Amino acid sequence: MKFIALLFTVFISLQTFGQEKFPDGTPIPDWFRQNNIVNIETLGGKYQITDYGAVNDSTLLQTEKIQAVIDLASQKGGGVIIIPKGTFLSGSLFFKPRTHLYLEEGAMLKGSDDISNFAIVDTRIEGQSLKYFAALVNADRVDGFTISGKGTINGNGERYWKSFWLRRKVIPKCTNMDELRPRLIYISNSNDVQLSGVHFINSPFWTTHIYRCNNVKLLGLHIFAPSVPVKAPSSDAVDLDVCKNVLIKNCYMSVNDDAVALKGGKGPWADKDPNNGGNSNIIIEDCTYGFCHSGLTFGSESVYNRNIILRRCKISNASRLLWLKMRPDTPQHYEYILVEDITGSAKSFLYIKPWTQFFDLKGRKDMPMSYSNNVTMRNIDFKCDVFFNVSRSDQYQLKDFTFENLNIRAKDGKCDKEIISNFKWDKVKVNN
């Protein structure tokens, strides 16, 4: 009898999941609940870097030896590059089709703190396609690429961070790219990507940048960059840039910038640039957040985002829960957003304001209106300083927002409902 009851429960659960839909009403594909971690036994031959001349030495630069192992695996039809227990120092590495990265428990791939050890390549950063420094780990046009294991990829960013803040003291308006520094992970133009189990820490710049990729899973990652004693500037945990079908699940994220940021392009004609585009069908679930600037951020270099879900997450001491960055120099449209089943705390619950850092209309006189619509926040138990940190603007329109079943404890619980057109409330408690 108990067995039958269990089967019935499982059946109901599967039926419930099968009925799940994205905010615009389209069904959520079964792919989003297939969360098995990749088995490296299925990925081809194994290439342990110490079998090919690399040595456990945190002070010895070994970029060429590690890259040679990647190239050898590629020449032989693919396989898994294994980082064994120990610390291995490297500059930029480039993975090839059918190659993978596996870090054993106790293994550390450590980035060089000398920028000259990173190649200058055609890449993508901050909503622009340009020449800049490669990341520590790069994979372009590598369908099926995986990073897995229980080891660590350490960006070794402290020297870069200190140099950035020193530059800011001398040149207050310097850009994020003016202080030359690499990202930790950059994956582009690839499908069916999985990153699982590994610690990504201390990135000099963005931690995990995914550009023009479809069907990407980030499972059980630990992503960290400090806010004290030295702030890690622009150390976003995950930047999704023109991506479709992405699952971020069971991850820990604590960085000195946005935890998950949706990118896609910037500038007055950003929506016309073929290198730019939108993000769609993104689910972030069952994650835990430490300090970050925002749990989920739209922008600042973003054009179009649709069907974005943040759910079943715990957030501690963030600056914001949901942040919509509205750039007055970029046409933007954010729609069909769902934030639900969240607990925790942040300075601001909802934050929507014009974002004018490095503002440049480039001479355009007829800048189009930007929009954010069909945003739902529900089933949330949250503590914050400011509940509704939203500003009016003649440069964007906000409409069709829903607040449902909220239990909010806020120092400032005021809400100007007139800012949003068709703003629906149901069972919202603020300081009750």
Give the residues covered by each predicted segment.
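Right-handed parallel beta-helix
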Residues: E105-G106, D143-T152, N191-N202, N214-S227, ...
